[in-house]
Amino acid sequence: MNKSLLTLSLIPIASVMHTYGTNHVPDNRPNIILFLVDDMGWQDTSLPFWTQRTMYNERYETPNMEKLAQQGMMFTQAYASSISSPTRCSLMTGCNASRHRVTNWTLRKNTKTDAVSNTLEVPDWNYNGIAQVHGTNNTFIATSFVQLLKDNGYHTIHCGKAHWGAIDTPGESPYHFGFETNIAGHAAGGPATYLSERNYGYDEAGNSTSLFSVPGLEKYWRTGTFMTEALTQEALKALDKAKKYNQPFYLYMSHYAIHVPIDKDVRFYDKYKKKGLSDKEAAYASLIEGMDKSLGDIMDWLEKNGEADNTIVIFMSDNGGYATGSGWRDEPLYTQNFPLKCGKGSAYEGGIREPMIVRWPSTVQPGT
């Protein structure tokens, strides 16, 4: 992950830890929400992260991102690694990918995920991910900042995608990193499906049909609840519970959206079809707006519960926008982040530039 971005994203957390570690402990330590979107490009929003609006800004509708930006600071040149696991491991450990050496996405234990090449020899890397304990080869060992928050009195909640470690390693479980609540997080880096009609990847007997089946959402099976909404509802319930503990909370709201498969979120799909978008692009846009609704629901919870002025909200994506698969995006490919080149998985700027917003009332100047 870009060093300056990582430093900026962790400044609020470091400040919190420093304050709590003194003898004069305030009663109002801030809550922290990291709202991380999967595969969201820098233009996949109605909020322009440039000097001018683009055609993609005109296409999508993300009013809650706009609201968050009005209340906080936009980072118009924010960067991540070009793919999921490296960014997520950097956020968890504070280490650049060149240091933790999780340089591609993780899934199966002791198995690399690199493409086969006749011209390049890929160096050995930590394909088992990260962990807090020794004992697994090709693993980077570090204490997560979540563990530090928990040890210093924060209630810690994980909701959504994890993707820090391979299957059957300590790093596959959010509980291993200090989370007290885990909603739907496991080793896989994407969902089998967002559709409750398909039980998010489970058969009727409750058996997983894929390594990408999303666990822990059984109550929503066959209810017509799109997974983005199911995760949001579970996060809100976890916040209701956290409110009773009389301690600050850390919520890692880590959506699977807008990772493939680009399933239609029927709450928003028809709107984009009426705009003239193709089936693929309307489905993609519906995923984006569903994510934005989730952001709005969480911001509404903060307002209704009197926590808005005492909560840091950090909005990010884990890499550049998806632009490489004709099964999910319209051709010509590699143009979806234009004028930047390429997209997710590429070291070109289209693969590493992402939207970022930070809101911290009374500390970060609004509208900057």
Task: Label the predicted regions.
Residues N2, S9, Y20-T368:
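Formylglycine-dependent sulfatase
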Residues T7-S15:
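Bacterial N-terminal signal peptides
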